[in-house]
Amino acid sequence: MIKKIGVLTSGGDAPGMNAAIRGVVRTALSEGLEVFGVYDGYLGLYEGRIEKLDRSSVSDVINKGGTFLGSARFPEFKQVEVREKAIENLKKHGIDALVVIGGDGSYMGAKKLTEMGYPCIGLPGTIDNDIAGTDYTVGYLSALNTVIDAIDRLRDTSSSHQRISIVEIMGRHCGDLTLMSAIAGGCEYIITPETGLDKDKLISNIQDGIAKGKKHAIIALTELMMDANELARDIEAATGRETRATVLGHIQRGGRPTAFDRVLASRMGNYAVHLLLEGHGGRCVGIVKEQLVHHDIIDAIENMKRPVRNDLYKVAEELF
């Protein structure tokens, strides 16, 4: 029977992680459990930086971005001896189970711990929205608002200077954040892992727009696909129109979470605790059609590539 649980955040931070921690802590305490926070993710678990949390530990955090527990990337956690040390630290505190908030790398760690006898529940916290088995990850819609704000500002200055702007947006192998940002921001062109890039066609379309009197253009580009500055130079050379690249970078991860993310994170945190109380381990939570669901964490890892949103790409194609 579970009496003590731990909670940690791992990998890249996302707005709403604090709300998720709060959901876990408050629910666990309401159910008569003791709760421990692990600082700086799996690194802190390995180093034994674990502290008991109470209701006041999560007061006034629901509106704050980032994660007060801290986060860190710790690839060494793949090593068996490192995980054994982490488990030793869990045992010192009598922790029976763990809620892991993060992305795909965090899920892999949770899977490994579950296989070694420590039941874990994964909670999707990443702005990339690249986790299978959930319509939304915690932090995604908050990041979307941040990107839209940046695009709106870039459109103002691009219009003033008759400039083409390339906006590089996070997402890694998933174009969801770029796609939604492009539609909501009224971007003229979109380049994601799902669309790929036909550079000649892109330049031809831009030239057609200029010939029709288009004064500026915004191109939404998913990170890691290509060098945004190099693409800007190629477009400027071909069109004669000033072209600049803006890499939004880590600003997308910061800021206060939206109301949606606060509610989503709270619901998921609550649900994760109840799954542990029901005896589940090696599962991950999600939300599908507004309903909370849970899946085998292995399925989420092996099917990390989310289905392509062909319906939204069709909308984007007709609007651009």
Swiss-Prot record:
Keywords: Allosteric enzyme, ATP-binding, Cytoplasm, Glycolysis, Kinase, Magnesium, Metal-binding, Nucleotide-binding, Transferase. Its EC number is 2.7.1.11. Its main location: cytoplasm. InterPro entries: ATP_PFK, ATP_PFK_prok-type, PFKA_ATP_prok, Phosphofructokinase_CS, Phosphofructokinase_dom, PKF_sf. Its cofactor is Mg(2+). CDD domains: Bacterial_PFK (cd00763). Belongs to the phosphofructokinase type A (PFKA) family. ATP-dependent PFK group I subfamily. Prokaryotic clade 'B1' sub-subfamily. This is ATP-dependent 6-phosphofructokinase. ADP binds at residues 22-26, 155, 186-188, 212, 214-216. Mg(2+) binds at residue 104. Allosterically activated by ADP and other diphosphonucleosides, and allosterically inhibited by phosphoenolpyruvate. Gene3D superfamilies: 3.40.50.450, Phosphofructokinase domain. Substrate binds at residues 126-128, 163, 170-172, 223, 244, 250-253. Coiled coil: none annotated. GO terms for cellular component: 6-phosphofructokinase complex. Transmembrane segments: none annotated. Pathway: Carbohydrate degradation; glycolysis; D-glyceraldehyde 3-phosphate and glycerone phosphate from D-glucose: step 3/4. Homotetramer. The active site is at 128 (proton acceptor). It comes from the Bacteria. It is found in: Cytoplasm. One of its GO terms (molecular function) is 6-phosphofructokinase activity. It catalyses: beta-D-fructose 6-phosphate + ATP = beta-D-fructose 1,6-bisphosphate + ADP + H(+). It is an enzyme of class 2 (transferase). ATP binds at residues 12, 73-74, 103-106. Catalyzes the phosphorylation of D-fructose 6-phosphate to fructose 1,6-bisphosphate by ATP, the first committing step of glycolysis.
